[in-house]
Design a protein with these regions (language model features):
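Alpha-helical transmembrane segments of multi-pass membrane proteins
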Residues: 1-464, 471-724
């Protein structure tokens, strides 16, 4: 009989713990798919990422804080789950067709105001009810906040593994979101056992099926009047193939990747570099080979090409849609294709190259910026032979170089000069940077002679057009602009060039974008780091003087939220810099933090007593962890270090959440306030770190700021401990 009672109790506890588990699963999976789709439609750089993540955290925090004003019932709890499951597909549909409301063309880049407005509206619809659900779950478990947080963390960890390793690699964003929603709808139905409401989950499932079927047709509507012939979501982005008459164009996250045929681009990316060393044998091409660059390289009879492409799906799409002649090029025995991150390939290869051609987009994101840093350029130089040439190209302007463009080009030029003694820039709508340890020339007569000797039949890199493009006046003008602009060096841990690229991006709009970026780029680090820290110290002094016990329990939660989200962003950027963009490992990094939260909250739940001294120890743990990371980062630590760091950071965060909330709830029964402040702290970190602090002040200075922030928080706790 006792066994039956124990079994019944265990089943009841499991059933009661499932709703917060579903909440964590729902929140993280929907957040991932919303972030991915938002990046497709709003220029997926760190600013986009920062806006949508910050808006998500903001509304989640507000939802949690205001939930106390909403009367709880189990019926409302169930309805809230179904509501969120329905709202996400509707938001994704609205996001896809937002271009019609914004009156923009397909693939056109939008400004900050539409981006900010859209992120706030979308997050309000999904994240606000999720914040309310956290408090509802606490009521459902009769005030057991720790069990809710524990199971929510476990649900998030499970969702991270399922979404990153099973849904994203095999399904589109819409299909993945629908599958995640369908799983939650079915589990919600069986968990709450509302047999009288069979029609509700059935209606939800039918809606999700219709949503899935509408995926590709809705994309065709989005791209009208262009003809969309294929769409494929991969772990690295959304690839879409458009056909206009005889031309095939590939778009990656709604940004133009390449078109075929496009002789101008393919010839320029190759010949200016190879004409400097026409006897080159070993050539490394990083990205962009399927667009025609490989065909141009093979015009040089001795070349053997190592072609590195991150996303294998690009090559598969090329085989499917490019003409047979281009498919034969990809199968040529002189070409070896490697599917991996270009930077990771360069770091690990033992081969030396006569030519390295970087054929990637400009450094508009931290991920791409890794290929334009001092450290990468030094590694490229190390892998080149004595007369080897390194080359890359970025969009520019033919006749007028604006101050914003000048700063961007100057940053790249001076960074390149840190590695190579000889640097030349080819003027034009696209600036081609050439660098070598051997003297270079851009004299028309020399290049023209080599074209004739090699019998090259080019259309754009030809004597007729080179005479105008390599006009000495234009060559000198671009050199003068590049050498006299801001001399900021783009480094792995201080990625300034992608901020300059964002400033340049802002000049495309007529709104406040340019003013905002110009303002922040002119600020000194004092206003970005020191001044906010001084304000925080004054706030702590005021709270200490007031002496309210709740302040000593709640302030560390907001600091923890800020610290952990900034630490996650720093770890991902640093990891990509050292080891390349390795999709599965990045996913595991994020999951390891969630696992740490689960373990930390479990540890907190098992504590026998709770007092302020325990918060002191945990806060001191944050300080030691940040100091350890900052010190170790300079030593190029092994991969496992980053996983352990995020696991430990999550563990401390989970433990602190339980202890501080336990102490706070003794003072006041407000289940959502602590969770809300945690999310609002994360909101501040997400908004500031990815878009401003990391590129402008760099990772080392930001880590120092985190250390100081947590130090003053520790002193605040010490003051509270002594006072009470």
């Amino acid at each position: 009989m006792q066994k039956l009672l124990d079994s019944h109790s265990w089943n009841l506890e499991l059933k009661n713990s499932l709703p917060p588990f579903l909440l964590g699963f729902l929140a993280l999976s929907f957040q991932i798919f919303l972030l991915r789709e938002f990046s497709v439609h709003f220029y997926g750089n760190e600013i986009t990422f920062g806006f949508i993540l910050a808006a998500w955290l903001l509304w989640g925090g507000i939802g949690s804080i205001t939930a106390s004003k909403i009367r709880f019932s189990q019926a409302r709890l169930i309805q809230a789950y179904y509501l969120v499951i329905i709202l996400l597909p509707l938001c994704l549909v609205g996001l896809r067709f937002s271009r019609f409301l914004l009156n923009i063309l397909p693939g056109e880049i939008t400004g900050i105001i539409p981006m900010l407005t859209s992120s706030l509206l979308l997050s309000l619809c999904v994240s606000f009810p999720l914040g309310v659900l956290f408090v509802f779950n606490t009521h459902f478990l009769k005030g057991n906040l720790y069990q809710v947080y524990l199971m929510e963390s476990l649900g998030s960890s499970t969702a991270g593994l399922l979404v990153y390793f099973f849904l994203i690699p095999f399904f589109s964003n819409w299909h993945g979101a629908a599958l995640a929603g369908g799983i939650i709808a079915l589990l919600s139905y069986f968990t709450f056992g509302e047999k009288r409401q069979k029609l509700v989950p059935l209606a939800v499932l039918i809606l999700l099926i219709v949503f899935c079927l509408f995926d590709f047709p809705s994309q065709k509507i989005y791209w009208k009047p262009f003809q969309l012939i294929q769409s494929k979501d991969t772990p690295y982005g959304k690839l879409q193939v458009l056909q206009t008459e005889e031309q095939i164009s590939l778009y990656n996250n709604n940004l133009h990747d390449f078109s075929y045929p496009n002789l101008a681009s393919s010839e320029e990316s190759v010949h200016f570099a190879l004409l400097k060393n026409p006897e080159a044998v070993n050539v490394l091409l990083i990205g962009g080979g399927a667009a025609g660059s490989l065909r141009q390289i093979l015009k040089y009879p001795r070349t053997q090409v190592d072609y590195v492409e991150l996303d294998p799906e690009i090559i598969r799409i090329s085989f499917r849609h490019l003409p047979e002649s281009e498919q034969e090029i990809l199968r040529n025995k002189r070409i070896y294709i490697f599917y991996r991150d270009g930077r990771a390939f360069l770091l690990k290869t033992q081969k030396s190259y006569d030519m390295i051609i970087l054929n990637l987009p400009e450094p508009a994101t931290a991920q791409v910026n890794r290929f334009y840093t001092k450290e990468f350029f030094l590694k490229a130089k190390e892998k080149l032979t004595e007369k080897g040439v390194f080359s890359f190209q970025v969009p520019s302007a033919e006749n007028y170089i604006s101050p914003e463009l000048q700063d961007f080009l100057s940053s790249l030029y001076h960074t390149l000069k840190q590695a190579f003694p000889f640097v030349k820039i080819v003027p034009g709508d696209t600036n081609i940077f050439l660098a070598s340890s051997h003297p270079l020339t851009l004299e028309f007569e020399t290049l023209n002679q080599k074209i004739e000797e090699l019998n090259l039949r080019n259309t754009y890199v030809s004597p007729q057009l080179l005479f105008s493009r390599l006009n000495p006046f234009r060559v000198e003008m671009i050199r003068e602009k590049a050498t006299t602009g801001k001399k900021a060096i783009n480094q792995d841990l201080s990625p300034i060039s992608y901020f300059y690229n964002s400033v340049l991006w802002s000049t495309q709009f007529k709104g406040i974008e340019k003013t905002v970026f110009a303002f922040f780029s002119s600020l000194r680090s004092f206003w970005l780091l020191d001044f906010p820290l001084i304000l925080f110290i004054f706030l702590l002094i005021i709270l200490w003087l007031k002496g309210k016990k709740s302040s000593f329990f709640l302030v560390p939660l907001a600091v923890m939220g800020f610290t952990t989200i900034v630490a996650e962003i720093i770890v991902i950027i640093a990891f990509q810099t050292l080891y390349g963009y390795l999709y599965q490992r990045i996913a595991l990094l994020l999951t390891s933090f969630m696992v740490g939260l689960f373990l930390g909250s479990y540890r907190g739940k098992k504590r026998k007593r709770f007092d302020l001294s325990q918060m002191l120890v945990i806060q001191a743990g944050f300080l030691l962890l940040i100091l350890l990371f900052q010190t170790t980062l300079k030593l190029n630590p092994p991969e496992i270090f980053f996983f352990i760091f995020l696991l430990a950071m999550g563990f401390l965060g989970g433990d602190l959440f339980v202890v501080s909330n336990h102490l706070f709830l003794k003072e006041k029964k407000n289940y959502g306030l602590g969770y809300g402040l945690d999310l609002l702290g994360s909101f501040g970190g997400a908004l500031a770190a990815s878009s401003l602090l990391i590129p402008l002040v760099g990772l080392p200075h930001l880590l120092t700021y985190l250390f100081l922030l947590n130090s003053f928080c520790l002193l605040f706790l010490v003051g509270g401990w002594r006072k009470n």
